[in-house]
Amino acid sequence: MENILDFTLEELKEWLISKEEKAFRAKQVFDWIYNKLIFDFNNMKNIPYKTKNLLSDNFYVGVPKVVKKLMSQDKNTYKFLFEYKDGNIIESVVMKYKHGNSICVSTQVGCRMGCKFCASTLDGVIRNLTSGEILSQIMAAQKEIGERISNVVLMGSGEPLDNFENVTKFLDLVTSDTTLNIGQRHITLSTCGIVPKIKELADKNYNITLAISLHSPEDLLRKEMMPIANKYSIKELMEACDYYINKTNRRITFEYALVKGKNDSIKEAKKLSTVLKGKLCHVNLIPVNEIKENSYEKSTLKNIESFGNILKENGIETTIRREMGADINAACGQLRRSYVSK
């Protein structure tokens, strides 16, 4: 059986026609799934009994089961552990803002990138998620909170560009007016910096925001923090970013997790200013999430602000990320790992 969420409307139409069914039934089915959030074919009232049986025999609506749901004390952040049909568990985080609800979705079960500050990668990668499985996190979360989600961040477990085909199909699906109709400008894709895939993504000409996990302007330190830096130097990464900016005319966000005594010095801030000077970019400074498997400590607020001020003085737009959901392990990979380790 196949997950119907992996299908575009046109693909489902073609399948129905091949079974001597009416093509317009595909639109009716999509309406039930994406607008009414009905995930059982038998509850789709305007679908004939014969067609329901045909669909049930060949497809399932692959929305995951909620195995854990946590809500922060301020009620603005929800953390979900979702379980797929094969028993694999991933996590998603919903953040409520005045401008709308945002979800951070996972693209893989685990991750193989090995970034030292990330809990998602500690057990390696188990498998890629399909386009429909990524999409299903949004649908399951919408059903749980009873509200529409209008912004998507691909920044949960997994490296999106390490699952390129499924992630790009997800982008095509989620932005389609036949499914969730989320605007491309409301989507952010975060990557540790797989250079050839950044260029390939640029050639797709999406209007999404690309976020690069940078974390150091120096190759030696970046190699220590992020194994991907052993393959691609900062020079190569910046060349790929320039290609992306020139191709899409979209501003890039550089994520920079500040670790006390490691990458939060004035010297590092000045070097970062030099690396990014003149680029169409924005820097998001992040107090690092402390995990027991490493000795990384959060930089002090004073250091973070001083670091940011140097960037601003050099004409680089900079913000400090607001921490949300710290009381519910909302950082990437923390909740899933504590759950599966039991």
UniProtKB/Swiss-Prot annotation:
Cofactor: [4Fe-4S] cluster
High-level lineage: Bacteria, Bacillati, Bacillota, Clostridia, Eubacteriales
Binding site for S-adenosyl-L-methionine: G158, E159, S190, S213, L214, H215, N289
Major localisation: cytoplasm
PANTHER family reported in the protein's UniProt record: 23S RRNA METHYLTRANSFERASE (PTHR30544), RADICAL SAM CORE DOMAIN-CONTAINING PROTEIN (PTHR30544:SF5)
Protease in keyword set: no
Cystine connections: C104-C332
Residues binding [4Fe-4S] cluster: C111, C115, C118
Protein name: Probable dual-specificity RNA methyltransferase RlmN
Domain Radical SAM core: 97-327
Active site feature: E91, C332
GO BP, sorted A to Z: rRNA base methylation; tRNA methylation
Cofactor: binding details: Binds 1 [4Fe-4S] cluster. The cluster is coordinated with 3 cysteines and an exchangeable S-adenosyl-L-methionine.
Subcellular location as annotated: Cytoplasm
Catalytic activity: adenosine(2503) in 23S rRNA + 2 reduced [2Fe-2S]-[ferredoxin] + 2 S-adenosyl-L-methionine = 2-methyladenosine(2503) in 23S rRNA + 5'-deoxyadenosine + L-methionine + 2 oxidized [2Fe-2S]-[ferredoxin] + S-adenosyl-L-homocysteine; adenosine(37) in tRNA + 2 reduced [2Fe-2S]-[ferredoxin] + 2 S-adenosyl-L-methionine = 2-methyladenosine(37) in tRNA + 5'-deoxyadenosine + L-methionine + 2 oxidized [2Fe-2S]-[ferredoxin] + S-adenosyl-L-homocysteine
Purpose of the protein: Specifically methylates position 2 of adenine 2503 in 23S rRNA and position 2 of adenine 37 in tRNAs.
The organism of origin for this protein: Clostridium botulinum (strain Hall / ATCC 3502 / NCTC 13319 / Type A)
Keyword terms: 4Fe-4S, Cytoplasm, Disulfide bond, Iron, Iron-sulfur, Metal-binding, Methyltransferase, rRNA processing, S-adenosyl-L-methionine, Transferase, tRNA processing
Alphabetized PROSITE patterns for the sequence: RADICAL_SAM
Gene3D superfamilies: 1.10.150.530, Aldolase class I
CDD domains xrefs: Radical_SAM
